[in-house]
């Protein structure tokens, strides 16, 4: 009997249904020669540092670096029952083979293998590797199960990725948190990503806008524009030289161009487009795509390929015709799909591009949740566009001379919309339409050598623009292309992270307080900027991290040694710990909490801040401090408040009501006067208001 282990219950249910396994028991489906169960994500995770040594519970510099050998693993908290269920099923005597049906990728391989290793199972492994949850794909995959050993290198790559993240994360986070007395989460991939955001923000902050001008002529219904003019006086001179004068068209250049159809989506380009059009975060897009995959409507989403394999051509043609019937695409002109444009076997590694499935024919798309529906239609749109004719257009550039100056008018004339018609119809169906990026309009008929009299001229003011903040669209692009210029063209993987992990990296930066969302923009916080400032270059370098990602890909292909990779990570960690044993006073100030000034120190004049238990001088060499739990206050059942401390610092006294007298068993009001003798502790004395004279002359 085969035991099939999926990554989550919904996938297990689909596999069981396809294989005719009807009977459901606790934690599995059984029947027809199969047991189908699931992992519920990561059931096994690396042990925390404290698991290796009780002393590691406290974060101390002297314990670093922490380099486990060997790495040990534990069952993820709260998932003990799920793990025990799989252990029991693996140990059943009637189970002779275990099928890994977790997601067909690096992380899915890791999820299964760690469970398999921890249970101590020695039974043969087979691999179900599919790119769609359609019944036909599952049946085909089950008929072509691969030996588990074929994916050993992929597992080693996944282990190296996990260990590298642990080594860098645990050591660098502890190191810089101890040095700066604040939890500073440092990650192998998230920190270089933060560095890119910080660099962009720094350029924006340093930017100083500059004014410039254009002179614009109205010529026979066309607008011709001068070159950039810095000086307003010069712009006025150009305007004066042209107003009511004649302009001569000295050249008209026409050029026919074509824009090829866009490629199909991989996960990163899908996330970018969904962010640009719908404002979805990378995580939202991945979640929607994963749900559509599990509903059998989209193919496997965590792919980095934008092509299909040649054996998919017939299926793709069928899916294209189905997608063309889905509103609003049913309004598009009919066309003969060019499937060959989307096929390239050499450009497909683990999984092909994301496309709809044959289930499109039976599905009620209108019943999908709005986020999933939008994403599904976006993928349909891209499939249709990718198989359509090119977009043909003509550009026109007309050059004029007037008053001794040159002006240019540009226009565009559409010859054949091709794939752009499909995109236009889809965009027009959206309630929130994105900005039109085409630019350029038809120019009136213009002839070289023709003179146009009495032209009008006007000056327009413009300002240079700062670098635009990153959006998830542009950040995903930057992550994907990090280090690209420094890697050989044949390198299969470039960039920070993988399509499957980039969304989580962005979310970690936001949840850690290093990045915040402002509309569509991602802006580093003050803490994020400061963190990048204090970290060493190996931890913030996008290029170095991209090289590591390339090494991991080489390990997955059996072309690099896992041990060498981890030795390099360990060496970098050791070097970082030894180099950063202390920090400057200026560095300490970067992460000092924002404090309110209560007053000025009576001894040295420096600001006094409120702490958890006191009000202390900001100058460490000055010993002035007012303790909130001073016995003077606690014996009178009062606490030194911020207002009272401010009065003492400003006036040397504060009025206090309701102080307790142990002797009389009652409360009283008095003025507390501060007597600072310059010692370690501050003394106080009480002053009582004088009573008015009574009738008998006594006070």
Task: Give the label of every model feature segment.
Residues 149, 232-265, 271:
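Metal- or metallocofactor-binding catalytic centers and their adjacent structured scaffolds
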Residues 1, 99-104, 181-183, 254-263, ...:
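Conserved short loop/turn motifs at secondary-structure junctions
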Residues 1-162, 166, 337, 466:
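Intrinsically disordered, low-complexity regulatory segments
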Residues 213-218, 396-400:
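Short polybasic amphipathic segments
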Residues 2-3, 79, 90, 173, ...:
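Basic, low-complexity terminal or inter-domain segments flanking catalytic cores
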Residues 9-16, 33-36, 40, 76-87, ...:
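Amphipathic alpha-helical transducer elements in NTP-driven molecular machines
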Residues 71, 93, 135-217, 254-258:
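C-terminal or mid-to-C-terminal helical accessory/interaction module adjacent to the motor/catalytic core
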């Amino acid at each position: 009997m085969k035991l099939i282990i999926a990554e989550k219950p919904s996938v297990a249910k689909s596999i069981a249904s396809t294989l005719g396994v009807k009977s459901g028991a606790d934690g599995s489906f059984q029947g027809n020669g199969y047991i189908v169960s699931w992992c519920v994500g990561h059931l096994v995770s690396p042990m925390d540092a404290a698991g290796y040594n009780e002393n590691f519970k406290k974060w101390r510099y002297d314990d670093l670096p922490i380099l486990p050998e060997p790495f040990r693993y534990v069952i993820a908290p709260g998932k003990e029952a799920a793990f025990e269920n799989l252990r029991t099923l693996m140990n059943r005597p009637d189970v002779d083979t275990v099928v890994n049906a977790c997601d067909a990728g690096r992380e899915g391989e890791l999820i299964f293998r760690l469970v398999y290793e921890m249970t101590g199972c020695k039974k043969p492994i087979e691999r179900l590797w599919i790119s769609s949850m359609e019944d036909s794909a599952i049946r085909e995959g089950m008929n072509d199960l691969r030996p588990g050993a074929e994916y050993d290198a992929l597992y080693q790559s996944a282990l190296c990725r996990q260990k590298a993240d642990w080594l860098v994360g645990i050591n660098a986070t502890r190191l810089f948190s101890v040095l700066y007395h604040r939890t500073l989460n440092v990650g192998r991939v998230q920190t270089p990503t933060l560095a890119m955001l910080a660099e962009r923000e720094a350029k924006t902050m340093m930017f100083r806008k500059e004014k410039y001008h254009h002179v614009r002529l109205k010529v026979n219904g066309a607008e011709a524009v001068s070159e950039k003019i810095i000086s307003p006086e010069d712009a006025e001179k150009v305007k004066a030289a042209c107003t009511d004068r004649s302009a001569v068209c000295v050249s008209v250049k026409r050029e026919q161009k074509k824009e090829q159809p866009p490629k199909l989506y991989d996960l990163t380009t899908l996330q970018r487009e969904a962010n640009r059009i719908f404002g979805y975060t990378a995580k939202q897009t991945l979640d929607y795509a994963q749900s559509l995959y599990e509903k059998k409507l989209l193919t496997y989403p965590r792919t980095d390929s934008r092509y299909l394999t040649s054996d998919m051509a017939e299926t793709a043609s069928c899916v294209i015709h189905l997608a063309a019937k889905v509103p609003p695409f049913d309004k598009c002109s009919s066309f003969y799909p060019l499937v060959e444009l989307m096929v390239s076997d050499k450009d497909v590694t683990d999984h092909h591009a994301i496309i709809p499935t044959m289930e499109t024919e039976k599905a009620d798309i209108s019943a999908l949740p709005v986020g999933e529906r939008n994403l599904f239609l976006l993928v349909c749109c891209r499939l249709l566009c990718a198989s359509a004719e090119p977009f043909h257009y003509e550009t026109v550039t007309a050059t004029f001379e007037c008053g001794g100056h040159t002006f240019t008018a540009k226009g565009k004339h559409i010859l054949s919309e091709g794939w752009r018609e499909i995109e236009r119809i889809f965009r027009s169906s959206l309630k929130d339409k994105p900005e039109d990026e085409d630019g350029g309009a038809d120019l009136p008929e213009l002839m070289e050598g023709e003179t146009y009299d009495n032209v009008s001229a006007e000056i327009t003011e413009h300002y240079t623009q700062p670098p635009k903040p990153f959006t998830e669209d542009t950040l995903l692009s930057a992550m994907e292309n990090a280090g690209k210029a420094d890697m050989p063209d044949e390198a299969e993987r470039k960039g920070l992270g993988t399509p499957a992990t980039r969304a989580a990296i962005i979310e970690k930066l936001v949840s850690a307080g290093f990045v915040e969302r402002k509309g569509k923009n991602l802006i580093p916080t003050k803490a994020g900027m400061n963190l990048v400032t204090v970290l060493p270059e190996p931890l913030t370098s996008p290029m170095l991290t991209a090289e590591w990602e390339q090494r991991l890909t080489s390990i997955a292909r059996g072309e690099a040694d896992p041990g060498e990779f981890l030795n390099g990570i360990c060496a970098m960690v050791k070097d970082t710990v030894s180099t950063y044993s202390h920090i400057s006073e200026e560095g300490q100030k970067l992460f000092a909490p924002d404090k309110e000034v209560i007053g000025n120190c009576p001894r040295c004049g420096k600001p006094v801040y409120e702490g958890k238990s006191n009000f202390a001088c900001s100058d460490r060499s000055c010993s002035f401090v007012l303790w909130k739990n001073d016995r003077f206050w606690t014996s009178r059942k009062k606490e030194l408040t911020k207002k009272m401390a401010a009065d003492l610092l400003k006036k040397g006294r504060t009025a206090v009501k309701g102080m307790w007298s142990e002797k009389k068993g009652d409360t009283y009001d008095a003025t507390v006067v501060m007597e600072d003798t310059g010692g370690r502790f501050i003394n106080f004395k009480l002053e009582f208001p004088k009573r008015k004279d009574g009738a008998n002359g006594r006070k």
